[in-house]
């Protein structure tokens, strides 16, 4: 039904629609199920005059090597049968970031690089020298003295064990920082790890400055980085949050400004731009 509708719309615009056909080999999310009837439907799509099936693809569940091989073989059997009957595809693709590294034979004509673009390593077998390309930074926006026994943030779930100073950082869960990191996460300030304290708010969170008494408003704080310079990397943050690396990155909302860099003289890849988040 979707193909017929798209064919009609393309006909009305007198412009051929370029499409990729999803073939479900066992992930059971979307796509044509693996059966003869599906191959018949795909043949019909290939014959529609205003559709150009440029590619065909599937997605691996990545359960284990054996199930990956079953899915790959299923995909290639379907593709080979279709191409033997005149359905030709410029691109055949089944490999995401993990499969592209761990199983080079699955790369075919195209790979769908996702997490690997950010330097996130999800692969286990393959070797690829990459470095995390994402650093999440902010700056101290406010510092307030807190006396021993006084509470911080909602419900006073953190109380000061001694007289100290508390810094507010202008980011929170509305920026994509997991709220369940309360009492677990550390951020990096002046080369030292300092704890995130109290309940993480929508637009702000707080850190304890006990170990960095010299901290000042405007100081840069690294929320997470590539693991160098005493920073937490995304792996560590995801473990603390009880999730995976991809979700931590995907949580980032549009509010934090993105600064794209090619690297600098120090080789860190950090931006020299002075901007606050959000």
Task: Describe the function of each predicted region.
Residues 4, 8-18, 24-147, 213:
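Active-site loop/helix belt of alpha/beta enzymes
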Residues 145-278:
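C-terminal accessory subdomain/extension
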């Amino acid at each position: 039904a979707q193909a017929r509708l798209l064919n009609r719309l393309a006909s009305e615009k007198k412009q051929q629609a370029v499409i990729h056909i999803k073939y479900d080999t066992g992930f059971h999310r979307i796509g044509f199920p693996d059966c003869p009837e599906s191959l018949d439907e795909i043949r019909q799509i290939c014959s529609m005059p205003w559709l150009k099936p440029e590619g065909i693809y599937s997605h691996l569940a990545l359960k284990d090597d054996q199930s990956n091989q079953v899915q790959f073989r299923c995909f290639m059997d379907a593709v080979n049968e279709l191409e033997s009957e005149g359905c030709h595809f410029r691109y055949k693709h089944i490999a995401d970031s993990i499969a592209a590294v761990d199983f080079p034979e699955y790369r075919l004509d195209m790979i769908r690089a996702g997490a690997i673009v950010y330097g996130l390593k999800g692969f286990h077998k393959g070797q690829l020298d990459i470095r995390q390309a994402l650093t999440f930074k902010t700056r101290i926006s406010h510092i307030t003295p807190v006396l021993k026994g006084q509470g911080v943030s909602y419900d006073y779930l953190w109380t000061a064990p001694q007289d100290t100073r508390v810094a507010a950082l202008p980011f929170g869960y509305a920026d994509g920082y997991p709220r369940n990191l309360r009492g677990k996460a550390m951020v990096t300030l002046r080369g030292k790890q300092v704890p995130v304290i109290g309940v993480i708010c929508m637009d702000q969170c707080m850190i304890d400055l006990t170990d960095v008494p010299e901290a000042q408003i405007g100081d840069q704080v690294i929320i997470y980085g590539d693991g160098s310079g005493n920073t937490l990397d995304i792996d560590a943050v995801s473990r603390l949050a009880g999730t995976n690396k991809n979700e931590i990155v995907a949580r980032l909302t549009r509010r934090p400004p993105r600064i794209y860099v090619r690297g600098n003289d120090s080789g860190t890849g950090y931006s020299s731009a002075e901007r606050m988040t959000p």
